[in-house]
From Swiss-Prot:
Keyword presence, Translocase: yes
InterPro entries with a match to the protein in the record: NADH_DH_suC, NADH_quin_OxRdtase_su_C/D-like, NADH_UbQ_OxRdtase_30kDa_su, NADH_UbQ_OxRdtase_CS
Record keywords: Chloroplast, Membrane, NAD, NADP, Plastid, Plastoquinone, Quinone, Thylakoid, Translocase, Transport
Catalytic activity of the protein: a plastoquinone + NADH + (n+1) H(+)(in) = a plastoquinol + NAD(+) + n H(+)(out); a plastoquinone + NADPH + (n+1) H(+)(in) = a plastoquinol + NADP(+) + n H(+)(out)
GO CC annotation: chloroplast thylakoid membrane
Coiled coil ranges: none
Annotated family: Belongs to the complex I 30 kDa subunit family.
Annotated signal peptide: none
EC number(s) recorded for this UniProt protein: 7.1.1.-
UniProt name for this protein: NAD(P)H-quinone oxidoreductase subunit J, chloroplastic
Amino acid sequence: MQGRLSAWLVKHELVHRSLGFDYQGIETLQIKSEDWYSIAVISYVYGYNYLRSQCAYDVAPGGLLASVYHLTRIQYGVDQPEEVCIKVFAQRRNPRIPSVFWIWKSSDFQERESYDMLGIYYDNHPRLKRILMPESWIGWPLRKDYIAPNFYEIQDAH
């Protein structure tokens, strides 16, 4: 079985991989990092006009990092909007994924948080800097191979 976006991508010979459907019937697609920006633009034009959420996670110690996008197709008069989940995987050594800030502005803080916690660089993001951790923090706290420092001095806020 294929979702509507997946069927459309197949019809137009755009490379992706279906990872199946979740318990709510939402299809999850895997997109290569180098194809992500063009498929994001296509998804927006296709009608996925709302980025419900973006998050990231460490797949396994020493393994890939994943950036996950939950897109919704909001249309006037439709009670059950169409949704899709897209996963973009990046290599741990130099994790780079194109930013979708210029398509969905709501990705701004979410991509910054993923950068701050996991070290995924979102190319062409206008303000990619730490958002939760101090600028002086070393490392990426949500990576499975992260070693927490024994001591960290927090500066006063004057």
